[in-house]
Amino acid sequence: MVASDDPRLARKVRRLGRLDMPGGGQVVVEGDYAYVGHLNPPYGTSIIDVSEPRKPRIVSRVMLDGEDTHTHKVRVIGDLMFTNYEMYNRYYFRRGDNIHEYTAKLEGELGRPPSDAELAHALTEDLYVGGKKKVLTEADIPILRAARERGYHDGGFKIYDISDKTEPKLIKHQRTHAWGSHRFDVDENYIYVSTEWEGYVGNILVIYDIADPARPAYVSHWALPGQHIAGGETPTWNADDNRVHHGMRHGDQIWVGALWGGFYVVDVSDITQPR
């Protein structure tokens, strides 16, 4: 957070208060409270009393176990708080999925098992983390091997009871697939989740009924043309470069942002058959 009163930073805007806290990915404000989804574990979600803007105060925090997950998106509907649950540093750890493939490829080229340094060089191709080129070293290879063996099984979203803002209570951890949910929209009836899904490449849009928050029920899903590889489709892009980033519902439409691919307007007048 910027802690400067330099008038050149903004026009007709002045800072009333500030908090020194870990960085956030999404901030939403409902009534007297702000909800911050933090970017980096172990910090999950903070609930902040902003009834006195000059004196904001943290009333509770949801902390995460371990370093495998981040929950940087948050939304609130009434007394329910929703957060994503997504594999942290996923582009980096995903390279571990390719270790066996690259080991076999290099062994064929070299006529011997590759060293960790050679594997790191091969796996570095087209690897970007946080928008920056990531160069792997031989020290990364044991980490990636361990992550591959460990796997990731927690991806999805969580629903909390926040009727008492000082003590959020977990209602449900809904697992989706693979690295889990990135961003989402939600209303009183449904949650619209961007998540990986069995049989598809990259994130697609998946809709759940949340009438009973303790038992979210799958309703339907929608994907970009070319994502359904299990159904015989072939993407025209590399890996998961194009995918559903998130959708926002407006009336009977969901406006879906496609990463590096523009946007789509999806008709959900029949929620069971998005088109």
Tell what function each PLM region has.
Residues 1-275:
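Feature marking well-ordered beta-strand scaffolds used for ligand recognition
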